[in-house]
């Protein structure tokens, strides 16, 4: 069994921030996603895949992250979700491009918005961005906001 205490701490801090600010953060994320993708904000739902359903490309994520950093006064590290999932994982996050069982467990904890049926054996690390939704970025913003006030 993998020690997920730090990952769980991140999730708990995110949940605490979202307890009082989810709608506010989601509204800003939704607007930023719509602007980046040049679509009507009504088309952005919390769990729609930004890549598979809304047509985002990797360059769009750079623009989105910049907009979110500006809107919330935060810094979002490149590959933030992946880095948090890998932190302290001695067994390795991936092997030959395939996310390990320990890595999948970490992603399930960090990304509760993702249908666990998508995080199964054989999942490739390059597929992680296909999991990203507006809700993923809501949680990412909350993580960075929480880290401003704690050591998470």
Task: Give residue ranges: language-model regions.
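Phosphopantetheine-dependent thiolation modules in NRPS/PKS and related acyl-activating systems
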Residues: 2-56, 60-66, 70, 74-152
């Amino acid at each position: 069994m993998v020690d997920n205490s730090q990952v769980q701490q991140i999730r708990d801090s995110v949940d605490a921030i979202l307890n009082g600010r989810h709608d506010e953060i989601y509204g800003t994320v939704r607007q930023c996603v719509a602007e980046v993708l040049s679509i009507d904000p009504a088309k952005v739902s919390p769990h729609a895949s930004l890549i598979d359903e809304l047509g985002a490309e990797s360059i769009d994520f750079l623009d989105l992250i910049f907009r979110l950093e500006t809107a919330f006064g935060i810094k979002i590290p490149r590959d933030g979700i992946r880095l948090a999932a890998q932190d302290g994982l001695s067994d390795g996050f991936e092997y030959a491009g395939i996310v390990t069982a320990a890595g999948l467990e970490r992603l399930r904890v960090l990304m509760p918005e993702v249908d666990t049926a998508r995080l199964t054996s054989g999942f490739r690390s390059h597929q992680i961005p296909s999991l990203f939704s507006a809700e993923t970025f809501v949680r990412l913003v909350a993580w960075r906001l929480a880290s401003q006030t704690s050591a998470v």
